[in-house]
From Swiss-Prot:
It is a peripheral membrane protein. Its main location: membrane. Component of the CatSper complex or CatSpermasome composed of the core pore-forming members CATSPER1, CATSPER2, CATSPER3 and CATSPER4 as well as auxiliary members CATSPERB, CATSPERG2, CATSPERD, CATSPERE, CATSPERZ, C2CD6/CATSPERT, SLCO6C1, TMEM249, TMEM262 and EFCAB9. HSPA1 may be an additional auxiliary complex member. The core complex members CATSPER1, CATSPER2, CATSPER3 and CATSPER4 form a heterotetrameric channel. PANTHER family: CATION CHANNEL SPERM-ASSOCIATED AUXILIARY SUBUNIT ZETA, CATION CHANNEL SPERM-ASSOCIATED PROTEIN SUBUNIT ZETA. Auxiliary component of the CatSper complex, a complex involved in sperm cell hyperactivation. Sperm cell hyperactivation is needed for sperm motility which is essential late in the preparation of sperm for fertilization. Required for a distribution of the CatSper complex in linear quadrilateral nanodomains along the flagellum, maximizing fertilization inside the mammalian female reproductive tract. Together with EFCAB9, associates with the CatSper channel pore and is required for the two-row structure of each single CatSper channel. Testis-specific. Expressed in adult but not in fetal testis. Not expressed in ovary. Within testis, expression is restricted to spermatids. This is Cation channel sperm-associated auxiliary subunit zeta. Disruption phenotype: Mice are normal but males show severe male subfertility. Mutant males display fragmented patterns of CatSper complex stripes in the tails of their sperm, leading to a reduction of calcium ions that pass through the channels to enter the cell. As consequence, the sperm tail is more rigid, preventing it from moving efficiently within the female. Mutant sperm are less able to penetrate the egg than normal sperm. GO terms for biological process: flagellated sperm motility; male meiotic nuclear division; sperm capacitation; spermatogenesis. The keyword Transit peptide does not apply. One of its GO terms (cellular component) is sperm principal piece. It is found in: Cell projection, Cilium, Flagellum membrane.
Length: 194
């Protein structure tokens, strides 16, 4: 008696769990299309992984790349993955501007730059990226939700202070959490205004 085994279709239509989808997120959230929307731009001007003919140069040594391997990115939080993608986008975009100038001068200026200025440039968000992200739906929605969360937490803090006291550890912990959200929000708004 022989049993027939049905092959599993490669593209099975099933809903992914919210945990899995939130872990990896949407690719559209990671990359900006601002530089790709320009007509007649060569791939090498946009990304360092390709030469003038559009061939991959992954086998070459990448001096200043900050990419994370897939194995490392599986252990990161979604916010850390997005931050890493933003840094990589800024580095890639910064190199694309240098290709217009003398290539040797850009290499020597990169080599002579201090590590502090390089670290600062990694943390400063790219203006084009943030402008594009601001025009998309998720950023205003995120700000709206963040405002509502802050309002709810402020009311809870007032209740905690009146009920269990100002010096209770839960009151202090909630107050620290609210201050952390405010600092992150102010930092993001500061970079958006520049």
């Amino acid at each position: 008696m022989e049993e027939s085994v049905k092959p599993v279709p490669k593209h099975a239509n099933h809903r992914r769990s919210s945990v899995r989808s939130s872990l990896y997120g949407d690719v559209r959230d990671l990359w900006s299309t601002a530089t790709m929307s320009t007509a007649n731009v060569s791939v090498s001007d946009v990304c360092e992984d390709f030469d003038e003919e559009g061939k991959s140069v992954r086998n070459r040594i990448r001096k200043y790349s900050q990419t994370i391997s897939i194995r490392d990115s599986l252990n990161l939080e979604p916010e850390e993955i997005q931050q890493q993608a933003r840094r990589e986008l800024e580095l890639c975009h910064g190199r694309s501007l240098e290709h217009g100038e003398d290539h040797e001068e850009s290499e020597t200026s990169l080599a002579s730059s201090t590590s502090e200025s390089l670290i600062f440039s990694l943390w400063k968000p790219h203006r084009t990226y943030w402008t594009e992200q601001q025009n998309r739906l998720p950023l205003p929605l995120m700000e709206l939700m963040e405002t509502e969360v802050l309002d709810i937490l402020k009311k809870a803090l007032i209740t905690y202070r009146s009920t269990i006291g100002r010096n209770h550890f839960m009151t202090k912990e909630l107050q620290g959490y609210i201050e952390g959200i405010r600092k992150r929000r102010n930092k993001r708004l500061y970079f958006l205004d520049q």
